C-alpha cells in the first residue's frame, strides 16, 4: 500500500508541474495567434485604404506591385481571418463582380466585413454596420 502512495504522490507532482506548463504554453500560443490576426487585419485594411484612395483620385490600382500587395494582404486573411470575415469578404466580392449592382448594397456588405473583423478581434461588439458606415473609406474620403 505504501508503494502506491509513493506512486500517487509522484504522479500528482508530475501533473502539478506539467498542467500549469501546458496551460501557459497554450495561453502564449493564443496570444501569438491573436497578434498575427491583428497584423493580418491591419495589413488588409491598409492595403484596402490605399486602393480606395487611389480609386478616389483616379489613379492606377493595377500592376505587378499593386496586385502582389493585394494578394499578400488576402493571403494573411486566408491564414488568420475568422470564417465570418472570409464569408463577408466573399459575399462583398461576389456582389461587386456582378455587372449591375447597387453601390449602397456594396457599401453595406463592406461594412459587414468591418463588423466581422471587429467581432473576431474583440470577441463581440455593440456596434452595427450602420455605426461603421462613416469609417468606410468609400463613404468618407
Where are these regions (language model features)?
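Conserved non-transmembrane functional hotspots
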Residues: 5-8, 18-141
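Membrane-interfacial hairpin junctions
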Residues: 1-3
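Single-pass membrane-anchoring alpha-helices
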Residues: 12-15
